[in-house]
């Protein structure tokens, strides 16, 4: 039924074509000189202009990717420094599928900013931030990106009490300009937050507030000035320290803006004794505490009453083995937010160990390694607060809520046909039992085809996927088959992409498609995401050696393929190491990381590293007055490429280290650890964490530690340290890996097509030799006619086979690409449907895509008048649902966008399709259906 429905829906809107007619063949070239008339494809994504209430509803429940891109040592950030799991698409999908639709990505930029080069931001660092943003955008989740620990209580460079505040503003502007330009073409799902918890050293609240407001104005002006979608983007700005009382009781004003009603207020909320104090004295959340919280959040009405939405960027509580109390607290927070135009983002710090003490500063909800919830009942409490109706004073809530599980429900439909770019609002109905307080969640099998959250289905790319609604408590589930077809548009779209790209592992480039329609936009697909990934913006990221094919598909169906070859990265079997000194110098207000001259290591052996203050200290350290190895958090040896942001982790799978000799200013120290230990952290980074460490202990006797500050005993103002060490058991990634069987390349292949007479076609590649081990990637040149399902296939007994789903009468060229250079082509003609399929036409109507308006980017900042007139033309949402807008018990609900909702019956008065059946032209009339809210 899935294939029949999608097929006939498409046929019902297709123009009549003679049987056997084939679409014109499109050449794929590397932008040869004969590409006349082709222009760079628009990278600016369609942007929906939503009201504050619509944004809050779509953003749903929020979650922080905490201790990840914000983790740092001496303001040198690293993704796995404060937690050990590298963020993946699966991590983000797990967050989404557990009910969250907003991810806040705190980012520390720190030493990734080159003060000596116009404040240039390290490209690999911002590229990694972009990758994680793309993982979220792929699910159509909202994403918040900020400047985080750079302004940490006067220890970073973003110091609001600086005597040279103009220089701070200059650097702040330069950094935000680069971030904004990098993301300027992203759609409405990306939000920028100006800063994190910024405050001065004293208690001069209004002085601090004035400085914060000054920076907020620089932020807004800078982002808006980069143009494209940044001219309309939602931005978020805090008051002093993101404190609710400071922000509401002192003179805090939002910055002036060139576009109206596009600013969030950012605040944080933690209850100090219950949520942050590292002891088990305060573990209970009470009704009195709830009343106090309601009163504190009521202060935010100063802004929400004016239509200004609020983001609670962080909230949460340490795990003190008090799950029921934390659940009560989280439900209260989200109930208050749900009734007050507020989005709440839970602080998840990503690291937990249930064997440790309960006060070990654990906020974790999601196990990022296993991709599963750690505390599902806490997530359930968050979502109950967000989606179940109740009084704003939370008087109906209490500790130990008993869940009445959903036992059954129905989807509003089983199948859906929708054009690329369209949005459809579905719902569940007939929920049993009626008194349930369970929640219905949503997920998609393939977000590249269609995404979903809270019943909102967005068509992203041609193909078929399954949308599943399921109850949170016991997993009662129902599914809908969604077929996405090409949107109606120009018939003569041309498309050109590079034939081949060659990359090194860990590098990236962009597809940079060219087209004769500047308003066309594209989706991208990689044949092998282990080798190459590709984002919604066409960013191609090389991950490991191999060959992959990237298909670029226009929203109207035209597609082209790029072969991507990923080769060895230079220096694959060597690593660069350096001594690092992490200062914790309150006397000079210097809290940063310094490093010495690196050495290159390629195997086991004995090596020596040095740090010389006169030669190795940076200009910033010298300017601050630092001139010796004093007042430190740690001295340690680390992978220098990781320190510089050139690598996320080390190229090693194993390595042990033993300290042989440590000399400070000519004095040899007494080493207490005489056995080898692992030099790798659990994150895979070569980082010894010692021999000097004021937190975890040092490997020498001549160190004194006070308040986590380390100094050398009896050595006055030491200038140099020399560390001699032995490495053993060193193993590089990929070393010694050999295939059990030698790969057998495809020498030649030919294709054949078999009509399965059910709206699908089998495409079969016959290869020589028959024992070839390469996989084959199949692509359709015009996916509006037919698209390949599961396009990558292995060779078995000399054949590889895939399935093509037909969408309309016409023709398309199918090309098969081997991992080597072998290719083959065949024309697939869709001429009609069988009599048995014709009855499927009554299943439903097509949900059409909205008109696309992608203007050319401009460096000119739009005036307020331009913003008002132009902001109504980007992608407008047209939605449809059979279900009543009234929420059912336990169901995630959201109000329809004002003036943007059309029922199928009202939107499609009549559809006439012309198909060929046994050589006879048959006209199928699809009559409009009445909505269930309409009297029949």
Task: Map each language-model feature to its residues.
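Aromatic-rich peripheral "rim/lid" segments of glycoside hydrolase catalytic domains that contact
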Residues: 322-405
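Extracytoplasmic soluble-region selector
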Residues: 403-570, 738-857, 895-906
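An active-site-proximal structural segment forming one wall of the substrate-binding cleft
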Residues: 85-100, 120-147, 156-191, 215-224
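N-terminal carbohydrate-binding accessory modules
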Residues: 29-102
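C-terminal membrane-anchoring or membrane-association module
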Residues: 916-936
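Extracellular Ser/Thr-rich, low-complexity/disordered mucin-like segments
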Residues: 882-911
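Extracellular beta-strand ligand-recognition surfaces/modules
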Residues: 615-653, 696-711, 718-722
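Active-site region of glycoside hydrolase catalytic domains
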Residues: 170-281, 295-318, 339-342
């Amino acid at each position: 039924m899935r294939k029949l429905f999608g097929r006939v829906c498409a046929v019902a809107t297709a123009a009549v074509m003679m049987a056997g007619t084939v679409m014109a063949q499109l050449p794929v070239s590397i932008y040869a000189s004969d590409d006349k008339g082709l222009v760079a494809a628009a990278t600016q994504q369609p942007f929906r202009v939503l009201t504050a209430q619509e944004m809050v509803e779509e953003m749903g429940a929020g979650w922080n990717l905490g201790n990840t891109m914000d983790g740092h040592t001496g303001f040198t950030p690293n993704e796995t420094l404060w937690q050990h799991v590298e963020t993946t698409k699966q991590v983000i999908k797990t967050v989404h599928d557990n009910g969250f639709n907003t991810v806040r990505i705190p980012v520390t930029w720190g030493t990734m900013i080159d003060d000596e080069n116009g404040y240039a931001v390290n490209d690999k660092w911002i590229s990694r931030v972009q990758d994680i943003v793309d993982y979220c955008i792929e699910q159509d989740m909202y994403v918040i990106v900020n400047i985080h620990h750079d302004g940490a209580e006067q220890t970073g460079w973003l110091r609001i009490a600086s005597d040279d505040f103009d220089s701070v503003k200059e650097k702040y502007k330069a950094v935000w300009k680069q971030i904004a330009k990098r993301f300027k073409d992203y759609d409405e799902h990306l939000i920028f937050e100006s800063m994190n918890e910024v405050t001065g050293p004293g208690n001069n609240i209004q002085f601090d507030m004035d400085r914060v407001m000054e920076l907020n104005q620089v932020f807004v002006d800078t982002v808006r000035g980069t143009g494209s979608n940044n001219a309309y983007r939602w931005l978020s700005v805090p008051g002093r320290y993101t404190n609710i009382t400071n922000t509401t009781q002192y003179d805090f004003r939002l910055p002036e803006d060139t576009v109206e009603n596009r600013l969030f207020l950012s605040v944080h909320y933690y209850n100090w004794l219950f949520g942050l104090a590292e002891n088990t004295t305060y573990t209970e959340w009470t009704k009195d505490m709830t009343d106090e919280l309601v009163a504190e959040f009521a202060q935010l009405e100063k802004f929400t009453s004016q239509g200004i939405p609020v983001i609670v960027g962080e909230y949460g509580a340490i795990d003190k083995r008090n799950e029921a109390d934390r659940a009560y607290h989280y439900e209260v927070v989200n109930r208050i937010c749900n009734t007050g135009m507020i989005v709440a983002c839970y602080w998840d710090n990503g690291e937990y160990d249930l064997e440790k003490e309960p006060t070990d500063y654990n906020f974790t909800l999601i196990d990022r390694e296993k991709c599963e919830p750690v505390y599902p009942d806490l997530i359930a409490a968050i979502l109950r607060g967000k989606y179940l109706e109740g009084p704003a004073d939370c008087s109906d809530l209490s500790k130990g809520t008993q869940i009445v599980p959903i036992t059954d429900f129905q989807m509003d439909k089983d199948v859906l046909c929708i054009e690329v770019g369209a949005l459809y609002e579905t719902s569940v109905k007939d929920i049993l039992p009626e008194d349930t307080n369970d929640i219905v969640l949503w997920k998609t099998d393939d977000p590249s085809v269609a995404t979903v959250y809270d019943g909102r289905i967005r068509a992203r790319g041609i193909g078929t996927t399954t949308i599943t609604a399921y109850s949170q408590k016991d997993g009662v589930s129902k599914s809908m088959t969604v077929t996405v077809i090409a949107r109606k548009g120009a018939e003569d779209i041309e498309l050109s992409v590079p034939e081949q790209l060659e990359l090194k592992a860990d590098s990236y480039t962009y597809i940079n498609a060219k087209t004769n329609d500047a308003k066309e936009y594209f989706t991208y697909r990689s044949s092998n995401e282990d080798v190459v990934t590709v984002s919604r913006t066409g960013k191609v990221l090389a991950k490991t050696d191999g060959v992959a094919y990237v298909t670029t598909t226009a929203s109207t169906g035209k597609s082209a393929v790029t072969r991507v070859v990923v080769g060895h990265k230079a220096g694959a079997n060597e690593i660069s190491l350096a001594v690092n000194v992490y200062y914790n110098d309150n006397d000079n207000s210097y809290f940063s990381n310094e490093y010495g001259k690196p050495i290159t290591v390629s195997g086991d052996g004995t090596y020596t590293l040095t740090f010389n203050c006169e030669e190795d200290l940076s200009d910033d350290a010298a300017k601050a007055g630092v001139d010796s190895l004093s007042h430190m958090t740690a001295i340690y040896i680390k992978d220098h490429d990781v320190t510089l942001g050139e690598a996320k982790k080390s190229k090693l799978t194993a390595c042990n280290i033993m300290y042989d000799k440590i000399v400070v200013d000519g004095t040899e120290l007494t080493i207490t650890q005489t056995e080898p230990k692992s030099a790798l952290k659990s994150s895979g980074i070569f980082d010894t964490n010692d021999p000097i460490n004021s937190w975890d202990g040092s490997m020498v006797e001549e160190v004194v530690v006070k308040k986590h500050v380390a100094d050398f005993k009896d050595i006055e103002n030491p200038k140099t340290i020399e560390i001699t060490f032995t490495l053993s058991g060193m193993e590089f990634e990929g070393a010694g890996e050999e295939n059990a069987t030698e790969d057998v390349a495809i020498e030649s292949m030919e294709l054949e097509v078999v009509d399965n007479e059910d709206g699908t076609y089998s495409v079969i590649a016959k290869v020589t030799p028959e024992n070839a081990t390469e996989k084959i990637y199949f692509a359709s040149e015009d996916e509006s006619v037919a698209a390949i399902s599961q396009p990558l296939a292995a060779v078995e007994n000399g054949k590889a086979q895939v399935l093509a789903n037909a969408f309309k009468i016409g023709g398309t060229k199918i090309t098969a690409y081997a991992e080597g250079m072998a290719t083959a082509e065949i024309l697939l003609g869709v001429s009609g449907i069988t009599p048995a399929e014709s009855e499927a036409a009554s299943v439903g109507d097509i949900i059409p895509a909205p008109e696309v308006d992608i203007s050319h980017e401009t460096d000119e900042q739009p005036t307020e008048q331009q913003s008002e007139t132009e902001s109504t033309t980007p992608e407008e949402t047209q939605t449809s649902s059979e279900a009543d807008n009234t929420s059912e018990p336990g169901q995630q609900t959201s109000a329809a966008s004002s003036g943007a909702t059309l029922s199928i019956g009202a939107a499609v008065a009549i559809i006439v399709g012309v198909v060929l059946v046994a050589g006879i032209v048959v006209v199928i009339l699809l009559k409009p259906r009445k909505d269930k809210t309409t009297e029949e």
